[in-house]
């Protein structure tokens, strides 16, 4: 809803840090457009965007040299508008009244387009490295017609594992540090969610 829109505009205000070739680098938000293919949605534009995974994945897997977090929307004109917003004077982006107004306008726009474009999600992770001494690439994609359903499944899965006593990790942890892969895959199967993998 409107909170997601506010968060998006807040994230456009300042550069964020990401690990590139083993060094931390400041990245301009919503920059370096790249077109990727998502089977459910076809080709879609994605842009650098600050997500918590830029930090937590680097902490969880320190051997990774480069971590790129990108985001995009369908229809693509939302990407173009967000790109333009990111280029506004920073003082405008830090004007809370303007951000509040734009957040409400943006949310109303999605209410108009969502019936035709849907409210789905597509995620992609690509890992490049070495396997058995040779260059290798691993690609995983996840797509679903309902983003809110998937978010609920994720939250519900963690709650289920804690309440059933299968997950014991006191404190505050990123999911990738708290949840073993075997339990993650088990909860996906229970919810009939599928991650497609290619090696």
Placement of each model-derived feature along the sequence:
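C-terminal catalytic/substrate-binding lobe primarily of soluble NAD(P)-dependent oxidoreductases
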Residues: 1-199
